[in-house]
Amino acid sequence: MGYKHKDLIGTRELSKEEILYFLEAAKEFKELNLSQVKKNDYLRGKTTINAFYENSTRTRTSFEIAAKRLGADTINFSSSNSSVTKGESLNDTMNNMAAMRTDIIVLRHPSSGAAKFAADRTEASVVNAGDGTNEHPSQALLDLFTLREHGKILDKNLNVAIIGDIARSRVARSDIWAMKKFGINLKLFAPRMMMPKDAEVFESQICKNMEEACEGSDVIIMLRIQLERGGADVAFPSSREYSKFFGLNKNRIKLAKPDAIVLHPGPINRGVELNSDVADGTHSVILNQVENGVAIRMAILNTLAKNRG
């Protein structure tokens, strides 16, 4: 089974089979990225636009590299240098992009639901590169790809801890929805004000402290405080205090399984949610995540382009 839809909006709507399709498809592109000539012409004659209404380093650059390695014509759109500053609506911006016969729009927007809104109103294919606190599907797919690459079997015997500002994290939501499709055992831990009020919808274990979250985990996914989404308004005394109770350090990682791996979607706040001795240590696969992001995004763009014919 492949993926036959026009857009990629979130992992909540994906089936287990569709997720596996993307993970398998990305293998070909990972091999290409490791070769001397990192390019093919699968998207020759296609146009992609990276429309980012929020700042981004890894995601925007990754999608740009992915499109160019597939041979597409790629344009980067920044809302701060566009007619958005003159009051143009998202709907009008998307329609104007589509009117230029754009094939794929990669959209990041501060409003939850923006990607679905845009996809329903444009003929171009839309990839959700993060919409508010809602979802970030390509990050979840690259996380699962990274888990498999490091020998983790995606089933009920896999213990994954997600720790940090879960309430404001679109990465956490996409990871959770994707991992639930495989029956993965999820443990969640966050400061009380950073745990979603409706956390029970995730049907996951809610941990009381870092030690419980780390104990016996195969995978630990650390999340930063989402300062730009109100995380700065949550009361905690200092970065040092946060690190003391909610940070991952070399002592806490010892509670996890010996072959446990540590993930982080970036950017890292070193000394806050993650100490440098862990971020740069043997358990960390953070840079591997970044590397795998290109392959996953190549698989996404190639699939949506093929679906368009």
Curated annotation (Swiss-Prot):
GO molecular function: amino acid binding; aspartate carbamoyltransferase activity
Cellular component per GO, a single term: cytosol
Residues that, per the record, bind carbamoyl phosphate: 58-59, 108, 136, 139, 266-267
GO biological process, one term: 'de novo' pyrimidine nucleobase biosynthetic process
Enzyme Commission number: 2.1.3.2
Enzyme class: transferase
UniProt pathway: Pyrimidine metabolism; UMP biosynthesis via de novo pathway; (S)-dihydroorotate from bicarbonate: step 2/3
SUPFAM superfamilies (alphabetical): Aspartate/ornithine carbamoyltransferase
TM regions (residue ranges): none
Gene3D superfamilies cross-referenced by the UniProt entry: Aspartate/ornithine carbamoyltransferase
InterPro entries given in the database record: Asp/Orn_carbamoyltranf_P-bd (IPR006132), Asp/Orn_carbamoylTrfase (IPR006130), Asp/Orn_carbamoylTrfase_sf (IPR036901), Asp_carbamoyltransf (IPR002082), Asp_carbamoyltransf_Asp/Orn-bd (IPR006131)
Keyword Transferase: yes
UniProt: L-aspartate binding residues: 86, 170, 224
Keyword terms, alphabetized: Pyrimidine biosynthesis, Transferase
Complex and partners: Heterododecamer (2C3:3R2) of six catalytic PyrB chains organized as two trimers (C3), and six regulatory PyrI chains organized as three dimers (R2).
Family: Belongs to the aspartate/ornithine carbamoyltransferase superfamily. ATCase family.
Function per UniProt: Catalyzes the condensation of carbamoyl phosphate and aspartate to form carbamoyl aspartate and inorganic phosphate, the committed step in the de novo pyrimidine nucleotide biosynthesis pathway.
Protein's recorded name: Aspartate carbamoyltransferase catalytic subunit
Native organism: Campylobacter concisus (strain 13826)
